[in-house]
Structure formats: C-alpha cells, structure tokens
Amino acid sequence: MKTHSDRKSGLHPRNRHQAPYDFDALCLRTPELRPLVFVNEHGTQTLDFADPAAVKALNKALLALHYGIAHWDLPAGYLCPPIPGRVDYLHRVADLLAESAGCVPTGKGVRVLDIGVGANCIYPLLGAREYGWRFVGSDIDPVSVKAAALLAKSNGLGGQIECRHQGNAKHVFRGIISPQERFALTLCNPPFHGSLDEASKGSERKLGKTVQGQPVLNFGGQKAELWCEGGEAGFLATMIVQSKEFAAQCLWFSSLVSKKENLPAAKKALAQVGARQVRVIDMAQGNKVSRILAWSFLDEVACGQWWQPALRGGV
C-alpha cells in the first residue's frame, strides 16, 4: 500500500518527518486514526487535511509514535498545530544555540520560554522530548494554561514544563520572567491576523468553503491564538521593544515570522533597541515558506560565556 507521498522538502536534517507519513504504523499506534485514512485516486493513503478531527488524530498518532507523548488532546475549538513544522522551529534554534555552546545543548540546564504556549503545549512537549530542555510556557488565556499544564503532567513532564498565566495582555515578558531567571531562548508563534474578521476571511480563502455561510477556521483557534490588534507586525514590534528590559536575562529571543514583508520593520526596531546580533533563519515545508527572526543583546563573546553557568547549574 502506498503512503501519503508529499515529501516534506526543506525540513531540518534532524526532523523525524522527512519521509512520507507511514499511516500503517501510525494507525497501529493510534487506532482512532484508521477510520479517517482513505486511498485517493492515485492509490495513495492520505487524510482530509481540511478536517480538524483528522488532523487532530494525526497529531496524536505522530506524537505517540515518534516522541513517546502518549497523552495529547485539546479543548474544543483550540489550535491544532502541524507537528513537522513546529518541531522544525526547535531544530533550527537548537543549531543557533550550538553556535555559542560548541554543540547542540541538551538537558535541563537549557531553559526555554515559550510565549503563547497555547492549549496544545506543542513546543514544550517536543522540546522536552527531543532535547531534554526545561520550559516555561506563558499564555494570556487561563484555559490554555490549564490545558497545557495537564498535558505536561499527563506525559510525565510536570517537573520539566511549567505553565504560567500572563495576567496583562499588554505585556509579553514582564510578569512572566522573574528578576533572577535566565533563559537560553524564547520562542513565539505570534498571532497572524489583526482582527477576527481578517482571520475568518483568511481561513475562508485557505479552505475555499463555508458552513452555512460561516467561515471555517481550519484546525480551530481561539482569539489569542489567531489574532491581536496590529496582527503579526504589531505583536513583533511590541515583543522587540519589551525584550530590551530582559536583555541580560535571555541569550536569544526568537519568533516565527509568517509574512516576510514584516521583516524590514522588525529589523529597524531591533536596531533601535540596540540588538547586537540579528538572524533570519529560513524554514520550508513543501510549498509553505516561513522564517525565524532571532536576536540577542549579547555579542559573540558574551554568548559563549553564557553557557558556563547555564550548563553547570541549570539556570
């Protein structure tokens, strides 16, 4: 039997999802996926990737088979992320950390902050399994914080993943990073759209269909996950300005940037706040192209010195 044949070109070499999905193995590990798999006109096993239930079942199977994450679920209506692309972000920034650490740093001595952890808790779960990193995940949505914490605990990672509620939606880091904390890295997948209407129209274009005249938001998604005032560009600008306050406490700040036209303004903002190093790291999965924007307020020498206490004491 053939399997889904779209090779995920452009993924990081360490990404476990280079090959087509092995639906037989996935269904064996997660039987609930089997009824959702069908053979298309080309004789290839596949899914309806516009069906949120199918994508959710695929995620559960991928996480269980490849990462030993046996318990994964979502509250109704929350964002269901694509696993190959999410783990690719982690592999790319792991290489960034390796530049100053001398090798890809692993273990609980590497602390990572995930801004907007979401109910899916996907970056902490994958990062803990792939690299053994220790995570703090923050979110302005209390339901997401509770759901993410439950996922961490259910998979035996409660001591490695801490979820914190951000009580002030205007703050990105303040109220989350305490005065004595240090993080090797911050992650963020910022809201893409600037309004609910924009998010709905974008989803309608993507799916090319409506249900009873109402746009279908593919894979779910709550307000904080999908849109914020100013959209991606506005969120990036706020995060960049606010990152300066924590310049000495974080080795690298980073964010996904879906719209490449947002990069020039972001780079200008980084120059204005005095970032010493700025990187744009390209990512690709099939036809989907994105990039990571990363910045540090430390020069290369200071970055190298960072790891001396970090790898000793787990700060």
Curated annotation (Swiss-Prot):
Enzymatic reactions: adenosine(1618) in 23S rRNA + S-adenosyl-L-methionine = N(6)-methyladenosine(1618) in 23S rRNA + S-adenosyl-L-homocysteine + H(+)
Gene Ontology MF terms: 23S rRNA (adenine(1618)-N(6))-methyltransferase activity
Pfam families from the UniProt entry: Methyltransf_10
Domain of life: Bacteria
Gene3D superfamilies reported in the protein's UniProt record: Vaccinia Virus protein VP39
Its job: Specifically methylates the adenine in position 1618 of 23S rRNA.
Protein name (record): Ribosomal RNA large subunit methyltransferase F
Natural source organism: Aeromonas salmonicida (strain A449)
